[in-house]
């Protein structure tokens, strides 16, 4: 039984890696998109549509100020959250409303939210793809950081 569980986790991770980080397409399709979010449903093996996303920026006094918001498309993606001009160096938090997503599917999840906190643009201007693989009782995240393409 443990082998089957590990195999399932491995296969879900494989799907996640092949779907979550297309280095070529992000830069070429969204060359003006400095921050893109992608969400995958590990239970159904598909993009997670209609997941509410909020992005916060840490202020100089340590508080979090809402910076951007959106919902994932049928492809599990949120584009155009911000512009190159507004996405300056700083600490950001991406909040995934996982509870509402799972409850809409008739499941009772453990997490209310999944958060990813990261420092952006501290080594020069970059483009970021934040990807999350969700299940009702766990989540995993990864990031693809690339130089912007003209």
UniProtKB/Swiss-Prot annotation:
Lipid biosynthesis recorded as keyword: no
Assigned keywords, A-Z: Hormone, Secreted, Signal, Sulfation, Thyroid hormone, Transport
Secretion signal, residue range per the UniProt entry: 1-20
Highest taxon listed in the record's lineage: Eukaryota
Pfam families cross-referenced by the UniProt entry: Transthyretin
PROSITE patterns: TRANSTHYRETIN_1 (PS00768), TRANSTHYRETIN_2 (PS00769)
Localization, UniProt: Secreted
Name listed for the protein in its UniProt record: Transthyretin
Classification of source organism: Eukaryota, Metazoa, Chordata, Craniata, Vertebrata
């Amino acid at each position: 039984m443990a082998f089957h569980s590990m195999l399932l986790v491995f296969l879900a991770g494989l799907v996640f890696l092949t779907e979550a980080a297309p280095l070529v397409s992000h830069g070429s399709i969204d060359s003006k998109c400095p921050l893109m979010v992608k969400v995958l449903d590990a239970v159904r093996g598909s993009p997670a549509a209609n997941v509410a996303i909020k992005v916060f920026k840490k202020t100089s006094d340590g508080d979090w100020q809402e910076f951007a918001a959106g919902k994932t498309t049928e492809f599990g993606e949120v584009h155009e959250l911000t512009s190159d001009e507004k996405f300056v160096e700083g600490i950001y938090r991406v909040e995934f409303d996982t509870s509402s997503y799972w409850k809409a599917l008739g499941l009772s999840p453990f997490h209310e939210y999944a958060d990813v906190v990261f420092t952006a643009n501290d080594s020069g201007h970059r483009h970021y793809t934040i990807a999350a693989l969700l299940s009702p009782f766990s989540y995993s995240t990864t990031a693809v950081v690339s130089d912007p393409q003209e």
